Amino acid sequence: MAKKNENTIEVKAINPRRVIVTIEGDSDLILNKMNDVSTRQLIDQRKDKAKDLTKPNEWEQVITAMHWLNGKPTEYSEESLVDALQNNAPCLTAFGLKKSFGQAVVRNEIDTYATKFDASVNVIGKGDGLVPIRFAEHHIDEKLMSPKKGSPVLVRLNRFSGWQADIEISFIENVYSQEQVINIINLAGFGLGIGSGRSSGYGRYHVIGVTSIVTE
């Protein structure tokens, strides 16, 4: 009986490094995702529901325009916002940060595509993929925005001064070194930024510290 050929495949363990990268804002950060009021209005339009003529709660618009580390508040008032800013934490998203890092790889011609970076570097968020920020001051800016259709609308933007964030990064060192990863993050912070209003120069940052995470 013929003996079968046996091929041995060596599977090498992946040992990613993990670090905490602390970034600090060079310009104010604006957090302004689609709020719950706008979401409801959009859904109603698509369902051809009659337009709700009641005045929207402006505090709901402000509060729900941000991701919150411990879940968004369920009451919408100035007091609720102050309490949330003190006892909860507004957040960036791990998805948004990693996307901007990948864009920096391509725009700075480190690689032609972000495919290799996306496969070898991860941004690890808390809970639902969130990265909380620390800040010195919070402001609400009122601004007239002109939609593609219809009249200008008044929007309220959450703007943070003196902000920082700790980002947990894992990466495969034989693909990108720690120095390269930090350089990419700095390039993203300088040229792209994070949050809303990036085209106007908001959300710029740089790395101020790197701490290794020791795993067993």
Tell me the role of every PLM-derived stretch.
Residues 1-216:
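RNA-interacting cores
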